[in-house]
Amino acid sequence: MIHLYGVVEELEALPPVAGVGAGPLERCRVEGLDLVVSREARDGGEVTQAALLSHANVVEELMARSGAVLPARFGHAFTDEQELAAAVRTKAAGLARTLNLVRGCLEFGLRVLGGDSAAENGSGQLSGRDYMQARLVVERGRRRLARELHEPLAELSRASARFGGASSDLRQSAYLVPRQDADAFGDRVRRLEAGHPDLTIVCTGPWPPYSFVANGEGEA
């Protein structure tokens, strides 16, 4: 099996780490794209924590050594070079565009939980029509607040992607942030936290830009 770790650019040398199953890392080129892979004798098999950690470690090492990395999620394995090349060839143009998008960037995740308990607590005394009107007011307020939280972070981001999340989530997003703006992004998150003590704001990262591999350009 051939395990794919990602598409890279400006990688001078492979990192001195082993891949999944302790296989050495290799480079190969398909349609002008530089891929980092490793080989494992056995087919697939059970997914282990060690394999997941090995994959994540390789991607992190590539992020530290490359101008751009388009990371592959764990499980992108191919039986041989021909199957790998065929899979990459069909998506080569899109991969090249997305590689350009993520160049020099890191991913940060944001989850915001905000309650509307006041509206919920009073809903028992409302008629059906009044309840629906009250809920509409609450939802409009939630959408407005979500935009207010998003816009200052989007200003520092090259792209963003929003996810559905749980019903209690006011917003759940990923932001593609240039490395030089990472500290400023963190500062803005902290200002949002200070300005909205009633909300739970959780920022994670930096991560490899997994959320933008399939999305291409986000909502920005």
Where is each model-derived feature located?
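An interfacial alpha-helical scaffold signature
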Residues: 1-220
